[in-house]
A protein has these predicted regions:
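N-terminal hydrophobic or amphipathic helices/low-complexity stretches enriched
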Residues: 1-18
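Cofactor-binding active-site loop characterized by glycine-rich and histidine/acidic residues
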Residues: 25, 38-165
Length: 165
């Protein structure tokens, strides 16, 4: 499905804004995996602002689409996307990865609204995604599951097992 030039430009502008917010978050935190964050921003922007069906006011809505950031170290980008979308207050970004913050380098699904799976151990996201998609099929649900993998985790055997499922 091709995007119109107007939609494409709007998404490009939003991704640029989110990259700036990611840079601010890195500055406030004093550290972060900025390369991983920058590399995933276009994908997350398009997923969240164009294709995913979600309700910010109801983050655990049963029929929502799921997003799993397998390369959990890119949480430095995921946090700004979730805050910009309205799941969390943008002020939380100023505490990213600081002692006592709900937002660590690897976002915790039990602490950060909008996170569907806690990730960080490389290679587990695809398996979680396959399980989530299989659950949708078994429950006769229409929600989609989006998984973003990092190239460095593709050597993990669990990815290949998930791919063969």
């Amino acid at each position: 499905m091709a995007l119109s030039k107007q939609v494409w430009l709007a998404l490009e502008k939003k991704a640029h804004e989110l990259r700036n917010l990611c840079l601010d978050t890195t500055y406030w935190a004093g550290s972060g995996h900025i390369g991983g964050g920058m590399s995933v921003m276009d994908i997350m922007t398009v997923c969240y602002h164009k294709y995913m069906h979600i309700k910010v006011e109801e983050p655990n809505w049963e029929d929502r689409d799921r997003f799993i950031l397998s390369k959990g170290h890119a949480g430095i980008a995921y946090a700004p996307v979730l805050c910009d979308f309205g799941f969390n207050d943008k002020e939380m970004l100023k505490t990213f990865n600081l002692s006592g913050s709900k937002m660590g380098i690897h976002l915790d699904a039990n602490k950060v609204r909008g996170v569907d799976a806690s990730t960080g151990s490389l290679g587990h996201g695809l398996s979680i995604g396959v399980g989530t998609a299989l659950a949708a099929r078994l429950l006769k649900k229409d929600y989609k599951t989006f998984v973003v993998l990092g190239d460095g985790e593709l050597d993990e055997g669990s990815n290949w097992e998930a791919a063969m499922s």
